[in-house]
């Protein structure tokens, strides 16, 4: 099982516009302590939108 204080936890990225959770990725907590935002393709909207980390 993964520890709660894992350095590279799995995070879910949700589209800002349609709120759909499209991507699962990992991040390094030491380099990015805040929530990350990435511009990714949203299949529901059919275009590139900002995806924000969800908890």
Swiss-Prot record:
Transmembrane segments: none annotated. One of its GO terms (biological process) is translation. Keywords: Ribonucleoprotein, Ribosomal protein. One of its GO terms (cellular component) is cytoplasm. It comes from the Bacteria. One of its GO terms (molecular function) is structural constituent of ribosome. InterPro entries: Ribosomal_bL33, Ribosomal_bL33_CS, Ribosomal_bL33_sf, Ribosomal_zn-bd. Belongs to the bacterial ribosomal protein bL33 family. PANTHER family: 50S RIBOSOMAL PROTEIN L33, CHLOROPLASTIC, LARGE RIBOSOMAL SUBUNIT PROTEIN BL33C. HAMAP family: Ribosomal_bL33. This is Large ribosomal subunit protein bL33B. It comes from Salinispora arenicola (strain CNS-205).
